[in-house]
Amino acid sequence: MAKFASIITLIFAALVLFAAFDAPAMVEAQKLCEKPSGTWSGVCGNSNACKNQCINLEGAKHGSCNYVFPAHKCICYVPC
């Protein structure tokens, strides 16, 4: 019985050691800030078109139509 416990302990220790070295490196996420699109005109009804315009014309990371009183506006997400 003691030999079985030793083997189980050794296997468990090996798994813990393997998991410690195999953990993926965490990359710090870049914070994004909202900025109203400078090139979009009118009410925003198509988030995909807004996203493409933000990325291609304004160099943003992302874009979407968001409700900003009193209407939906194209909002670009740029690095802070």
Curated annotation (Swiss-Prot):
Gene3D superfamilies: Knottin, scorpion toxin-like. Predominantly expressed in leaves. The keyword Membrane does not apply. Residues 1-29 form the signal peptide. Induction: By pathogens, methyl jasmonate and ethylene. Up-regulated by ORA59/ERF094. Keywords: Antimicrobial, Disulfide bond, Fungicide, Plant defense, Pyrrolidone carboxylic acid, Secreted, Signal. GO terms for cellular component: extracellular region. It is found in: Secreted. GO terms for biological process: defense response; defense response to fungus; jasmonic acid and ethylene-dependent systemic resistance; killing of cells of another organism; response to ethylene; response to insect; response to jasmonic acid. The modification Pyrrolidone carboxylic acid is found at Q30. The keyword Repeat does not apply. Disulfide bonds join C33-C80, C44-C65, C50-C74, C54-C76. It comes from the Eukaryota. Transmembrane segments: none annotated. Confers broad-spectrum resistance to pathogens. Has antifungal activity in vitro. PANTHER family: DEFENSIN-LIKE PROTEIN 1, DEFENSIN-LIKE PROTEIN 14-RELATED. Belongs to the DEFL family. This is Defensin-like protein 16. It comes from Arabidopsis thaliana.
